[in-house]
Amino acid sequence: MRDEVDLSLTIPSKLLGKRDREQKNCEEEKNKNKKAKKQQKDPILLHTSAATHKFLPPPLTMPYSEIGDDLRSLDFDHADVSSDLHLTSSSSVSSFSSSSSSLFSAAGTDDPSPKMEKDPRKIARRYQVELCKKATEENVIVYLGTGCGKTHIAVMLIYELGHLVLSPKKSVCIFLAPTVALVEQQAKVIADSVNFKVAIHCGGKRIVKSHSEWEREIAANEVLVMTPQILLHNLQHCFIKMECISLLIFDECHHAQQQSNHPYAEIMKVFYKSESLQRPRIFGMTASPVVGKGSFQSENLSKSINSLENLLNAKVYSVESNVQLDGFVSSPLVKVYYYRSALSDASQSTIRYENMLEDIKQRCLASLKLLIDTHQTQTLLSMKRLLKRSHDNLIYTLLNLGLWGAIQAAKIQLNSDHNVQDEPVGKNPKSKICDTYLSMAAEALSSGVAKDENASDLLSLAALKEPLFSRKLVQLIKILSVFRLEPHMKCIIFVNRIVTARTLSCILNNLELLRSWKSDFLVGLSSGLKSMSRRSMETILKRFQSKELNLLVATKVGEEGLDIQTCCLVIRYDLPETVTSFIQSRGRARMPQSEYAFLVDSGNEKEMDLIENFKVNEDRMNLEITYRSSEETCPRLDEELYKVHETGACISGGSSISLLYKYCSRLPHDEFFQPKPEFQFKPVDEFGGTICRITLPANAPISEIESSLLPSTEAAKKDACLKAVHELHNLGVLNDFLLPDSKDEIEDELSDDEFDFDNIKGEGCSRGDLYEMRVPVLFKQKWDPSTSCVNLHSYYIMFVPHPADRIYKKFGFFMKSPLPVEAETMDIDLHLAHQRSVSVKIFPSGVTEFDNDEIRLAELFQEIALKVLFERGELIPDFVPLELQDSSRTSKSTFYLLLPLCLHDGESVISVDWVTIRNCLSSPIFKTPSVLVEDIFPPSGSHLKLANGCWNIDDVKNSLVFTTYSKQFYFVADICHGRNGFSPVKESSTKSHVESIYKLYGVELKHPAQPLLRVKPLCHVRNLLHNRMQTNLEPQELDEYFIEIPPELSHLKIKGLSKDIGSSLSLLPSIMHRMENLLVAIELKHVLSASIPEIAEVSGHRVLEALTTEKCHERLSLERLEVLGDAFLKFAVSRHLFLHHDSLDEGELTRRRSNVVNNSNLCRLAIKKNLQVYIRDQALDPTQFFAFGHPCRVTCDEVASKEVHSLNRDLGILESNTGEIRCSKGHHWLYKKTIADVVEALVGAFLVDSGFKGAVKFLKWIGVNVDFESLQVQDACIASRRYLPLTTRNNLETLENQLDYKFLHKGLLVQAFIHPSYNRHGGGCYQRLEFLGDAVLDYLMTSYFFTVFPKLKPGQLTDLRSLSVNNEALANVAVSFSLKRFLFCESIYLHEVIEDYTNFLASSPLASGQSEGPRCPKVLGDLVESCLGALFLDCGFNLNHVWTMMLSFLDPVKNLSNLQISPIKELIELCQSYKWDREISATKKDGAFTVELKVTKNGCCLTVSATGRNKREGTKKAAQLMITNLKAHENITTSHPLEDVLKNGIRNEAKLIGYNEDPIDVVDLVGLDVENLNILETFGGNSERSSSYVIRRGLPQAPSKTEDRLPQKAIIKAGGPSSKTAKSLLHETCVANCWKPPHFECCEEEGPGHLKSFVYKVILEVEDAPNMTLECYGEARATKKGAAEHAAQAAIWCLKHSGFLC
């Protein structure tokens, strides 16, 4: 038989490929086609006049170029084209027309807009124009071959219907393509062809999540190109509505089959309503409208086409004759290459190898059974499936490629991610059974190769024989060797299996004979190969297009959608499975004179018949499209839908499967547990149907869902999944859009009411917003100076310096209203230089009366005193008018007076020092120059000559002077009568003052004989609230700094203003700053106390601490309270969520908690309560201190605020030292984190002073609901009884003895040890208890360290807590208590990891904190937290019990000596201390991170690298390695400040902060006596039932407060009376025995409406008894509830008398 044969097959020209411009012979063929065009008149489309039709170009020669599917058109002479045009279509489908789009136009106008530079009509072909015209009139399916320009028709249609999507329209055009590569390709074509905004949405691109984002996306774009799954998802969940789509284009629309679950079909069946007035225009494109093996049969062909038309509500149109396409596309030559069947001896050899592989597989299965516990059935089945898949792949490659191919396939799979989809994540050799099989198989198969033959010999031409190479593979090699010499040759080989593609590509690349072929493989993204990502696929295609590769071995992913061009040879190594596959793969050969080849076994008649059938079926399909033989369609299967009417979200049975998988994937998981639903199908022969039972993961809120009895397994599966979605939505796990709640959404339910945050004017929670700072109300109360008498409350400010090296003038504080008690006794320490300080105390001194003159003098004195402090430049002129500024009395001013005092009667009576005040105000600077003393000269003994006149010595002494030569102010302390200008300058024995001044300033003294003035410089005011003390130093006396100056160079400014007054004045701004902040804190306390009586005990100073940030640089800040409040907030919210949401998993609980406690939400709630105005976030800046007499000069209003407080403003004279300007409204910048921190700090403050009750009330006041009811705690304990059947598998008594606690509710203890991989008990696991226990432990540890180390900084407090409760620390506790022995788990790998880590700790107990050794399994730490959660519930939320327990087995202080500081942090501190530079970089490869760390010291660079599972682990290892190397090469010591504090710092007794709640009584719970529940032995047999049911797990919801429980008849049992209903008791009995829940059914209903009676029956399967099903009937009752209750009583009676219930 010949090796090849040419088939005389006439291939329709409409399915032929593209021509290459670069080849010269294309030009010759092009000219032939142009001549043929001119010699004949082709019928193309519907009859119309070319001269008058709007869409045809004018009668001129118009050039056509490439467009659409990257095709090449020919120049076209319009005058020679006939007007007899015909369109092939079916008349069986009714026409769809629309008047709004009956005409072609650019953006809806006859003439294109000047902006529409791109007009796709200019390069359109005749048939494209006519098909586009039809598409504007009705829904159309264009049937044209690959390369015929279908995309260009779609582009023209978008252009013509542009008026529907251009602004201000709110609709959009959506272009659907089935693959990501095709989406990107088609989006580029559209963007290049029309001036519309095009957006891409597909896998790997930016994900639009929210409804608002999709609204913006639609508004911003006219065309959206996406995969159909994305559109289906958006329609299902109401992100996009069908009414918003004006044009819907389906590329490769043949996927829309009536009986398929393809997204195309789902979109049309569920969401497209043909009767709707707002429905999109439909346009479909396909090269084969019929798909499927059976669809091409004569009886099904018409039915398939009609069904496609019905589903898309469109007609199929094509060209009638292929002649018109001949000028645009080329037909490949179809050839068949035969190979002979294997010889008998080779066949025997192959059989021998098959048996060898089968024997290896059986041995691996036997070893697998020994490794896996009998209870771990799912793991066993999973590994069996993986093993079978690997075995089938080797057998397949052995038969199709030969022995060498099988060897390569084994090695390829062994060394790659062959089983990445389903294999357990663990890399433990014992669990890698597939690797064991592949290794043994490769070794066994390699034994068949001669030992003296090396790889190069095997790949030589002589070795191309059986059994090493199959005859099929040899034939392929021959074909490629023939074509290898052809220029510009490119080839695609199509195979049906991924393993064939990878192995064949490997073999071809290693054949010396085919070295001119450069090969790679191309498989789908869903293949499960990590190496085949979207990026790698794009890289392969680009390399193929750039001729770097010229051979692709592809699966069916290369048949359609991918932009694979210029291909000359297409080989079907494996025959196509369908006609569609035949047509699509043939369309890849687009080059002229290309070849489409089949490899066929000459002894296999089926293969020859299959090829012949492809052509026959294709011709039959073309004929059927033209002449429809029947109007019959496929039966439409209307799926059941679940719709949420509130939102419009809708899901079908088919889509519910993927939604259920998506929900399960969102459940908490790790490398040991991948949650997914498991399906079991039970055929019911007598009814001829199937029931599907879904078992959900153990951490899902429902355990099992069972479908109704349905005819097929697929229908049953859809029904069960849809019921699961319904139930999950009812439980609130899926929101009203049928989606799991996003972590980005704000959890509104935990706030008491709604709050429109966006309506706050200019004050949001964004980063860095402007807020007004509150001024105390007491400071705003004015006095009226016009009255004859003003009474002010007075307070004595006492200064006590330490040491007593200064004298401070006594001052008083005067204001209109009295201070609160806490403020009256305020005392603070002001820190000076050199460890010195001043203690300040406030004492109330009654009421002081001021007459009219006195109040004016007091006001003037304060103004002058504040000028001296802050605006001394205004005192430089010779004359300063003495009058109070009007701005001092504005509403924004503060009204208090600071005046010097005199003490009388032993300091018990105070009075204002009016002598000093009047003396100061009589100073020369405040008098006109004419009054100055100038006539006394020369100076006498009682007078001194100053620069501004002669003055009495008494006036000069204790005054403020100004020197013109040095521009400085000085306090005159004394007159140096023994020293004058001729005296030597101190510290200089030769130079006199005369010489010194002349040399420095060029000034000659005229009166050098005058005595010198001993003066003290006037210093600048500082923030004295800042902590300047060093704990290891003692305060030291500091001599005051004095200098001597000549009087004649000094200007007398203010008399009587002594240095003692100056010293006191320098303290007052710090004192008043603290007083103002304290008064604000007291005001907030009163506001809160009015609403929350429970916090009345909190002190104002505690509130002030909570309001003061670290930025204020004071000795108090909110940070420690914030750490405490943060821990309590987490605890309180966790407790609330745990009890109120029994159906939510741990991951969703965590997300909801995060939404409550995150900064954005806390900021939002704080602003709602106006808390931001109380926050103190600015340090005292003397340049920004404003008081009465020194008002703020920056007037702020809505217009000026942005300019005044612009963050980008230029620095000016109003700029403060802190970079912020203080305005008249007290605006300052706050960040949302600052506001959130204040909320948490307030929680901590109320916690310390008022306990849990006060903190909880505050949280409720601010809008965080953390309430719960005692009944919810009791219900949680009762619900744990469902785990009691598992108590027989664990020795609970031993566990309780180890924990030193006896549980009242044993089910809680059992639940705390159930890993989510264990799902043989009806569901439930420890994760919810872990969530609760984590929050409890976090608060307890915070309370512990907060009280034990009172001087610990907040950052150190957080670090210490993290180190004490991190995973390794808790895992060590779990190991020490042997908690792993009680773990319920079905993961082999997890058991092995725990065992390895336990053995490691046993051999090296101090190495657990190091990076060496096995990694610490998180499960061990989770067990500790879940135990604490169970204990917390079992003792009724008695935190004292948990505190005692925590101290007993955690003992946080015990291991402080072995505290392991993070090597990352240690390295950072080390580099900072030695000023070394460090650099870090990370790369990811094969799922692992390699971290390179560089440290540069003294010009030398030290580099280390380490690898970890994630970047953090790699960085930790690299840091540890770097520290080791540094210590080895350098003489360095590492210091740990945290360690130093712990060893040397103050340590107090540990206390539980704030717990003052009453424990919940869970001891005397009324309910089911669990001892009377028999756990029966397992019997064989299964009762069958067709009705559906749902098993719920979790806590029962607490009854509404407004509803009273109806009295029910008590069920008397041996254990005592029970107040539960019989129905509830029956449910609990089923749960406790792991039975299915009872099924209640109304079987009889009689009587008129007002006298109706009901009879119920209950069906109960006793699964542990052989085929036992109870069916109990109750008596007639007036209500359904009563009837069901009576039926339940009957069932209880039956169970008791049957011995199942004692």
Curated annotation (Swiss-Prot):
Every copy of the RNase III domain together lies at 1083-1251, 1292-1436
The answer on whether this UniProt entry bears the keyword rRNA-binding reads no
**What Pfam families does this protein map onto?**
DEAD, Dicer_dimer, DND1_DSRM, Helicase_C, Ribonuclease_3
Which lineage do the record's taxonomy fields give for this organism?
Eukaryota, Viridiplantae, Streptophyta, Embryophyta, Tracheophyta
The positions annotated for binding ATP are: 144-151
Gene designation: DCL4
What is this protein called in UniProt?
Answer: Dicer-like protein 4
Q: In this protein, which residues make up the domain named Helicase ATP-binding?
A: 131-307
Motif DECH box: residue span? Answer: 251-254
Whose protein is this, by species?
A: Arabidopsis thaliana
